[in-house]
Each structure stands twice: as structure tokens, then as C-alpha cells.
């Protein structure tokens, strides 16, 4: 009897945990929608001229990793946010210094750990998506690694199945994975997944 009760309790906890991650993910987006969408828009405006990504590498959001990407070379630097070398590096490589500092401040305030863009193709047409990761304090189970919510912003409306999973296209039921992860619908062009890694 006790064994059956334990099995039922564990099953209920697992179901509640899987449901709560979806609720937590969509709630975090809804609660911070304005800030998150602002970060995505700012990044989109800054990125085409000089491609880059930003990631915070410490828990207090004081150390930022700046990845500057060109056709031939990728430079990766790590700075404390207040360090003068950060501004000097941005100026040296002709980045919008004020714009990137604004983005860094917004990411700190919203607890966005990473932002980057990726190119992909659909029917031989180039597409782009922007992914940002958030580290909410609420998603943490006993004996489990920290969890991150990854949001992907597409330029156009996407297709989803009846479970809300991102599909390759309207004409197929094949689930599309990004970086090995299944993404779920928030809006027609914004999806989320829960991941152990922030990038």
C-alpha cells in the first residue's frame, strides 16, 4: 500500500513539474514581454552592421563575454561590465558602443544570460532567428542542474502541431529542433524551450 502511494505521489510530482515548466516559461515571457521584446528589437538593429553575441558568465551579471563575428574571424573577449577595455574594444572594431551598453544594462535588469542570432534556410530561402536565454530562479528541482528558458524569435510566423511544438513547415508534421531542442509555441513567431545550458 505504501509502495503504491509512493508511486502515485512521484507520478503526480513528475506531471506537475512538467506542466509547471510550461506555465513558468510562458508566465515569465508574459510578465517581462515588453523588456524581452525590447532586447530582441535592439539586438536586431545592432547586429546586421557588425555581427556579435553577448553572454554573462557569472551569477551576478557583472562579467560579459563579447563574441565579435566576421566572415574570416571570431574574436571572443571577456570583460567586467564597468571595465574601460569593453568600450575601447567596441570603439576599435566600430561597434555601436552606446547601443551595446544599453543592451547590456537591459539584459542585466531582465536576467537575460545570452543573446545571439542564427541563419538557417527554408526552401533555399535565407532566414534568421534570434535566441535569448533567461535564468529564472523558479525553475530548479532538487538534485537537478540549473535550468534556462531559451526564447527564439523568428522573423515570420511559424507552424506548430496540436501540442504546440515547432514544425519544419506547414506541409509536414516533422518537429523542428534547434540546437537539439524541441521548441514550444508562445506566439506565432516566438517559441521557448527549457534547457540545461544557457547557450
Task: Show the residue positions of the predicted features.
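Hydrophobic alpha-helical segments and their boundary regions
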Residues: 6-7, 83, 100, 178
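Generic hydrophobic secondary-structure signal
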Residues: 10, 36-39, 186, 190
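Low-complexity, intrinsically disordered/propeptide-like segments
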Residues: 8, 12, 16-17, 49, ...
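Bacterial Sec-dependent N-terminal signal peptides
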Residues: 1-30
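N-terminal export/targeting and maturation segments
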Residues: 19-104
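Extracytoplasmic electrostatic interaction patches
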Residues: 91-93, 97-199
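Acidic/proline-rich low-complexity IDRs
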Residues: 4, 8, 12-13, 65, ...
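General "foldedness" signal
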Residues: 15, 50-53, 57, 165, ...
Amino acid at each position: 500500500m505504501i509502495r503504491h502511494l509512493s508511486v502515485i505521489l512521484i507520478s503526480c510530482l513528475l506531471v506537475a513539474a512538467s506542466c509547471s515548466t510550461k506555465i513558468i516559461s510562458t508566465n515569465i515571457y508574459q510578465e517581462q514581454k515588453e523588456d524581452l521584446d525590447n532586447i530582441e528589437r535592439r539586438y536586431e538593429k545592432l547586429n546586421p552592421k557588425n555581427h556579435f553575441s553577448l553572454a554573462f558568465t557569472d551569477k551576478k551579471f557583472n562579467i560579459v563575454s563579447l563574441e565579435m563575428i566576421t566572415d574570416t574571424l571570431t574574436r571572443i573577449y571577456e570583460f567586467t561590465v564597468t571595465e574601460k577595455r569593453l568600450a575601447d574594444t567596441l570603439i576599435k572594431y566600430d561597434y555601436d558602443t552606446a547601443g551595446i551598453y544599453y543592451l547590456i544594462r537591459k539584459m542585466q535588469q531582465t536576467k537575460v544570460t545570452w543573446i545571439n542570432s542564427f541563419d538557417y534556410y527554408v526552401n533555399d530561402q535565407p532566414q534568421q532567428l534570434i535566441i535569448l536565454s533567461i535564468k529564472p530562479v523558479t525553475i530548479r528541482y532538487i538534485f537537478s542542474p540549473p535550468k534556462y528558458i531559451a526564447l527564439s524569435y523568428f522573423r515570420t510566423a511559424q507552424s506548430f502541431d496540436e501540442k504546440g511544438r515547432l514544425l519544419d513547415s506547414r506541409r509536414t508534421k516533422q518537429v523542428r529542433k534547434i540546437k537539439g531542442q524541441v521548441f514550444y509555441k508562445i506566439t506565432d513567431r516566438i517559441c521557448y524551450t527549457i534547457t540545461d545550458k544557457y547557450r
